[in-house]
């Protein structure tokens, strides 16, 4: 059986501008103890991806700095679909000079994903990266799904993720 991984960002993917604006316009809370509340429509699309592919989730969002346990606690508290197995490492340090290291800051997530795959994935693993920013390595482009931060994961994007993960 082929291992499948979903590298998942939150802001602009599950936490959408549309849903935040909707909650604010209704005078309802748009945050809980974990942060911004995720858009139920985006969560439903995530559920479709997980149900169809059985992919494990690796968090690439800046929320990862809260730690893996905090991410897993939030997943359980919010009854989110799938299983968060890890967070990507932080390979870009604030003390680094990106220019001196030949690293483009816009590719930092891509470097972290590449490092995670090297350290953890078995050969021939399938993966997708879902993010609202182009923050990947060129070699990861075939695995990349770019969301509109206002809409997050849509039906069309979920279908693409399913096709990529299921081959």
Enumerate the predicted regions with their spans.
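Alpha-helical substrate-recognition element adjacent to the catalytic core
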Residues: 3-96
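Short, exposed beta-strand "edge-strand" segments with a Pro/Gly-rich flavor and a Y/T-containing core
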Residues: 1, 64, 149-153
């Amino acid at each position: 059986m082929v291992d499948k991984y979903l590298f998942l960002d939150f802001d602009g993917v599950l936490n959408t501008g549309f849903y935040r604006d909707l909650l604010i316009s209704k005078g309802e809370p748009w945050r809980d103890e974990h942060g911004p509340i995720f858009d139920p429509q985006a969560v439903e699309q995530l559920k479709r991806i997980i149900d169809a592919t059985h992919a494990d989730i690796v968090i690439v969002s800046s929320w990862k700095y809260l730690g893996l346990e905090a991410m897993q606690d939030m997943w359980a508290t919010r009854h989110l679909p799938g299983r968060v197995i890890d967070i990507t490492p932080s390979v870009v340090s604030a003390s680094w000079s990106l220019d001196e290291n030949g690293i483009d800051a816009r590719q930092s997530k891509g470097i972290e994903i590449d490092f995670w795959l090297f350290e953890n994935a078995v050969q021939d693993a399938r993966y997708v990266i879902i993010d609202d920013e182009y923050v990947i390595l060129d070699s990861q482009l075939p695995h990349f799904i770019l969301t509109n931060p206002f809409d997050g994961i849509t039906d069309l994007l979920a279908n693409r993720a399913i096709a990529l993960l299921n081959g």
